[in-house]
Amino acid sequence: CCKQSCTTCMPCCW
């Protein structure tokens, strides 16, 4: 779970 620029647990940094 990456929450850098996302509000929910999304693969935004994966």
Curated annotation (Swiss-Prot):
GO terms for cellular component: extracellular region. Disulfide bonds join C1-C13, C2-C9, C6-C12. Keywords: Disulfide bond, Neurotoxin, Secreted, Toxin. The keyword Signal does not apply. GO terms for molecular function: toxin activity. Expressed by the venom duct. Signal peptide: none annotated. It is found in: Secreted. Belongs to the conotoxin M superfamily. The cysteine framework is III (CC-C-C-CC). This is Conotoxin BtIIIA.
